[in-house]
Amino acid sequence: MPDPAATRAGAARARATALARAGERLDRLSLYPRPVRRERVRIVVAPFAFRLPWLRRFDGYAAWGLILLRSAAEDDDLLTHELCHVWQLQHRPLRMPLSYLRSGYDGNPYEAEARAVVAATRRPAVAATAVATATATATATATSA
C-alpha cells in the first residue's frame, strides 16, 4: 500500500513544477511592470468547490494567491491561464475582480488577456499582437472604469 504522505509530497512537487512551467511562460511577456510573484501561490485541487453553481462551468479559479483546480490532471494551459489572473490581481487587486461585475465573464478584458497569453506562449507562431491587443483592451476598459 502506498504511503499517503509520500503520495501527497509527490503531488505537491508535481504542482510546484507545473507552477514553475506556467511562470516561465509568463516570464516571457512584459504585460505588467513586475514579473508574476509565484512564491506564495498555492494550488489546491478542490473538485467539491466546482459543484457550487457559480463555479460549475469552470475548470480553474484564481483568487489572489490561490489557484483552485477541478482535477489534478496536469494542464499547463489551464495553469498558465489561472496564473495570469494571479499576475493581473497582483497589479490590479481591486480593478480586476470588480471588472467581472461590469462586463461579466464572457466580455471581460482580463479573461481575453489570459486567453491571449496562453495562446501566445503555447505556440511561438502566434503573433505577439494577440497579447498586445488583449492588453490594450484591458487597459482601455480598466481606465474608463
Where are these regions (language model features)?
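Compositionally biased, intrinsically disordered low-complexity segments enriched
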Residues: R8, R13, T17, T129-S144
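Polar-ligand-bearing catalytic/cofactor-coordination segments
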Residues: A63-S71, T80-L83
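A metal-dependent hydrolase signature that marks the N-terminal structural subdomain at the beginning
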Residues: M1-A46
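Pocket-edge structural micro-motifs
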Residues: V45-P47, R70-A72
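Short linear elements at protein peripheries
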Residues: A5-A6, E24, T80, A116-A127
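Short, flexible, glycine/charge-rich loop motifs used to bind or transfer phosphoryl groups or to couple energy/partner
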Residues: L31-R34, F50-R51, R57-F58, L68
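Post-HEXXH active-site segment of zinc metalloproteases
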Residues: L52-R56, A62-A63, A73, D77, ...
